[in-house]
Structures are given as structure tokens and as C-alpha cells.
């Protein structure tokens, strides 16, 4: 298959879960290709849930692709109830964030003193997050804003580029989807 079952390919769950509808859709689109300005699109990307806005390729992977531009998606919020992972949040301690930065960004900023979104895209997605500590600071940019925190601790999972960061007490940070609020 050309599609994997990870977040790289989104929601594909393997041939074992195919059914009449999915088989018919595959058959109906056999031989159909996607073109942009007469050129075959060789890197068609998608996602199952965008949090309310897509994002420009330059803000995710750093290169400009004319057909991958960010747009607000008002439809998304109207069907959010259909997506079990649309609303999400997690809490992380300063010590956890420090360990993530050490292991995933190969940097030790010391005791974490502050974390904040330092840049938003035109569509309101996070494209830079700054971590400040007693030994310096580190700024994660583009896709790294999302992927940096994933995979080190089971309870930490940034599911999209559309989120907020809220500082709790001196050592607690709340991260949640852009539609939810944090209390605590």
C-alpha cells in the first residue's frame, strides 16, 4: 500500500477494515489523478480534523507550495461532535518540558520559567512556541511546535497546530485545543 496507518497518512486503518463502500470508492477513483496548473500533484496531503483552519505548507514544512495554503474552515466546528479527538488537552510540568527539550531538541534550558506561543499564522495556528528557562531559551517553529512534545510522555499529545498554552502555577503548563478553555 502507498498509505500507512500512522499520523503520516491519518486515518487509514488497513485492508482488514475495508468494506463495500471503501472498495467502491477506490474502484470509482481508479485512474483519477490530481493536477494543479496542468502539473501532476505528487505530494497530496490531508488530515481528518483541522481544528478550524488548515495551514500553509511554508508554516508547516518550510517550503512554499501554491496549492497548500491555509484557510479558515467554518464547517469544521459545526461537525466537531463527530470527531472524538477534536477537543483535547493536557497538563505538563516544567520538569517534564525540560526533559522533552533535552531529549527531543538536544537542549537544556534549565528550570522552565515560562512557555508561550510566540507566533501565530494568519489563520490563527501556532507556528512558534518559546520555552524560557534559567539557562536560556528555545523556540520550536513550524511542525516542530506540534511534534516536539509528542512521544516522550504518554499523557502529552499535541494533536494539531491550533492550540493555546496557559501557565498555571509556577511549574504547571496547560495545552489545549483552540476551542476549549483551561481552569485550574
Ranges and model annotations:
Residues 1-184:
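Conserved, single-site charged/polar hotspot
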Amino acid at each position: 500500500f502507498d498509505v500507512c496507518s500512522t499520523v503520516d497518512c491519518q486515518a487509514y486503518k488497513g485492508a482488514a477494515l475495508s468494506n463495500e463502500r471503501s472498495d467502491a470508492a477506490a474502484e470509482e477513483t481508479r485512474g483519477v489523478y490530481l493536477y494543479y496548473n496542468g502539473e501532476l500533484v505528487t505530494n497530496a496531503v490531508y488530515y481528518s480534523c483541522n481544528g478550524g483552519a488548515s495551514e500553509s505548507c511554508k508554516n508547516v514544512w518550510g517550503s512554499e507550495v501554491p496549492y497548500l495554503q491555509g484557510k479558515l474552515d467554518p464547517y469544521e466546528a459545526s461537525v466537531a461532535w463527530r470527531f472524538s479527538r477534536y477537543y483535547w488537552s493536557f497538563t505538563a510540568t516544567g520538569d517534564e518540558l525540560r526533559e522533552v527539550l533535552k531529549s527531543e531538541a538536544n537542549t537544556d534550558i534549565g528550570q522552565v520559567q515560562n512557555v508561550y506561543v510566540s507566533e501565530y499564522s494568519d489563520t490563527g495556528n501556532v507556528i512558534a512556541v518559546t520555552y524560557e528557562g534559567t539557562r536560556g531559551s528555545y523556540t520550536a517553529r513550524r511542525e516542530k511546535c506540534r511534534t516536539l512534545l509528542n512521544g516522550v510522555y504518554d499523557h502529552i499529545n499535541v494533536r494539531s497546530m491550533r492550540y493555546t498554552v496557559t501557565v498555571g502555577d509556577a511549574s504547571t503548563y496547560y495545552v489545549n485545543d483552540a476551542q476549549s478553555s483551561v481552569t485550574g
